[in-house]
UniProtKB/Swiss-Prot annotation:
Cofactor entry: Zn(2+)
Gene: mutM
Pfam families: Fapy_DNA_glyco, H2TH, zf-FPG_IleRS
Key words of the record: DNA damage, DNA repair, DNA-binding, Glycosidase, Hydrolase, Lyase, Metal-binding, Multifunctional enzyme, Zinc, Zinc-finger
Positions that bind DNA: 90, 109, 150
Lyase as UniProt keyword: yes
Name under which the protein is recorded: Formamidopyrimidine-DNA glycosylase
Enzyme Commission identifier(s): 3.2.2.23, 4.2.99.18
Length: 269
């Protein structure tokens, strides 16, 4: 599933092609995604795209009358292609642009979404999200206040979008390993010093993943159709039973909140 770095890489890739371009048409071949594509999204026709934003794992294409909200789901991708490029299987949505290019959405599993947010409103999917991890709002003090008294495992805690957005399973595993924190430790029992390190590591891991073009394990490709290379940098995710890269201890694998969790029993306390 594309996580924050993959969505940010997509945003960076499409922005030079779509920013300040007018949407001349929208072609919906299959509107049955995670939620049905609303008819209101046709309001984007003949509107200029004034900004391309990311909020959590949602991309927003802003226009003067509203924003198209795009979620890549489990297997979605956006690519910029020349006009007239024949659609392939699972190419569900095209935005035709005044430049002569098209922004094409492909989603084999159809767990993604295209939604519409009228101007000066906030769609319910965005209403209760926590802060962005790569901003100054996400600090150790903030995380400490939220964690106070919480018995939830720290891994589940940092994956909660109401606490902080965009720390998906891959990056939660990697950040906790880098910070030396056991993923099953209660969030309220993590010391302020350890939370400071964790915040720094979350920021560092996400920033490096973006720099590497995201993580391609199966489906993800960027706007140029290329995979991300952060998978080559993974230290623990997907490596249960292998030696810890720091101490050589066999990495343990458990389920936390039904998600695969890999950690080192020696390095993470």
């Amino acid at each position: 599933m594309p996580e924050l770095p993959e969505v940010e890489v997509t945003r960076l890739g499409i922005t030079p092609h779509v920013l300040h371009q007018t949407v001349t048409d929208i072609v919906i071949r299959n509107g049955r995604l995670r939620w049905p594509i609303p008819d209101d999204i046709n309001q984007i026709k003949q509107q200029p795209i004034t900004k391309v934003r990311r909020r959590a794992k949602y991309l927003l294409l802003d226009t003067p009358v509203g924003s198209a909200i795009v979620h890549l789901g489990m297997s979605g991708s956006l690519r910029v292609l020349p006009a007239g490029t024949a659609p392939e299987k699972h190419d569900h949505v095209d935005l035709a642009l005044s430049s002569g290019e098209i922004l094409r959405y492909n989603d084999p599993r159809r767990f993604g979404a295209w939604l519409w947010q009228p101007v000066d409103t906030k769609h319910h999917v965005l209403a209760k999200l926590g802060p962005e991890p790569l901003t100054d709002v996400f600090t150790a003090d903030y995380l400490q206040q939220k964690a106070k008294g919480k018995r939830t495992a720290i891994k589940q805690f940092i994956m909660d979008n109401h606490i902080v957005v965009g720390v998906g399973n891959i990056y939660a595993n990697e950040s906790l390993f880098s910070a030396g924190i056991h993923p099953q430790k209660a969030a309220g029992e993590v010391t302020p010093q350890a939370l400071t390190v964790l915040v720094d590591e979350i920021k560092a891991v996400l920033a490096f993943a973006i720099q590497q073009g995201g993580t391609t394990l199966k489906d993800f490709k960027n706007a140029d159709g290329k995979p991300g290379y952060f998978a080559q940098e993974l230290q623990v995710y997907g490596k249960g039973g292998l030696p810890c890269p720091k101490c050589g201890t066999e990495l343990a694998e458990v389920k936390i909140g039904q998600r695969a969790t890999v950690y080192c029993s020696q390095c993470q306390q």
